[in-house]
């Protein structure tokens, strides 16, 4: 079958032993819940070697490799990807090539066309599971580099950080070697994510950038629950409901526009 070799499982432990993940090859155990892996249930841990993931079609060591194998979810059966604590680079920050957009659009780190996609960190601290990029306008890109371009209704992101660390240091608490200094200190447009769809939810997610941060901009309706955002100007999503969120503004004008449905802030600071 598709079980990992026993020796690679025996020694498995996630980067945060205080919230253990038991990995048994074809299933996970986390927070007293058993998760059976399969065609619509993937597990990703950047610690795993290529050899360790080679024999398992549902286990990956990079988010991008997992994304290449997503199949469309439905409301009843979403496409779920579970992420162990790590820093997952959506775009290689060490690649010297300049990113250029196609068809008059911004350059993207990753375009994901998958309805009812659930991206879930296996740790209650969002800063421990990071989806990262480090490019912006004139900084490794022509145009406003945007880490993600999501297409599809029903996107859920939970218990993780989405950050464009072009002008913000990435300080990773669980393993110093995974931290990275910002690309530059001048403020430039460095986007996090666009989203084309409805019924989008972000739960306990940190969105980090500065100018034009764009946390899942473009959604018809989106709920941000218990999220934290750092940005300057023209950055927040217009038709969003922000519930129990913390917002750190480093500028005067956080919205570009909010006339598509109005933004609602409940119990935020």
Give the ranges of each region predicted by the language model.
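Extracellular "leader-to-stem" segments immediately downstream of a signal peptide or signal-anchor
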Residues: 1-80, 99-106, 127, 136-138, ...
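Short, T/G/N/S-enriched strand-turn elements that build extracellular solenoid repeat scaffolds
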Residues: 33, 61-74, 89-113, 213-219, ...
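Feature marks extracellular polysaccharide-active and adherence modules
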Residues: 45, 84, 120-122, 151, ...
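Surface-exposed cleft-lining segments at the edges of enzyme active sites
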Residues: 52, 188-189
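Glycine-rich beta-solenoid repeat tracts in large extracellular/virion proteins
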Residues: 108-112, 131-132, 146-151, 169-171, ...
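Sequence/structural signature of small/polar-enriched beta-strand/turn repeats
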Residues: 137, 170, 242, 259-265
């Amino acid at each position: 079958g598709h079980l990992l070799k026993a020796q690679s499982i025996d020694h498995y432990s996630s980067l945060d032993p205080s919230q253990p993940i038991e990995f048994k090859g074809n299933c996970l155990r986390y927070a007293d819940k058993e998760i059976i892996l399969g065609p619509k249930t993937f597990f990703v841990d950047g610690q795993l070697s290529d050899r360790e993931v080679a024999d398992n079609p549902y286990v990956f060591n990079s988010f991008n490799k997992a994304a290449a194998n997503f199949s469309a979810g439905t409301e009843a059966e979403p496409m779920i990807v579970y992420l162990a604590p790590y820093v997952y680079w959506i775009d290689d920050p060490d690649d010297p090539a300049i990113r250029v957009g196609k068809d008059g659009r911004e350059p993207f780190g990753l375009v994901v066309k998958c309805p009812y996609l659930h991206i879930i960190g296996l740790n209650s601290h969002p800063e421990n599971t990071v989806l990262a990029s480090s490019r912006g306008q004139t900084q490794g890109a022509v145009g406003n580099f945007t880490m993600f371009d999501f297409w599809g209704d029903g996107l859920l992101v939970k218990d993780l950080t989405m950050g464009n660390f072009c002008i913000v240091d990435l300080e990773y608490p669980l393993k110093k070697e995974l931290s990275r200094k910002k690309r530059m200190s001048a403020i430039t447009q460095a986007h996090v994510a666009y989203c084309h769809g409805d019924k989008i939810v972000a739960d306990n997610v940190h969105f980090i950038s500065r100018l034009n941060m764009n946390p899942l901009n473009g959604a018809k309706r989106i709920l941000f629950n218990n999220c934290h955002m750092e940005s300057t100007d023209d950055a927040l999503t217009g038709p969003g409901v922000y519930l129990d969120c913390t917002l750190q503004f480093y500028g005067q004008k956080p919205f570009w526009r909010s006339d598509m449905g109005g933004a609602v802030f409940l119990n935020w600071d």
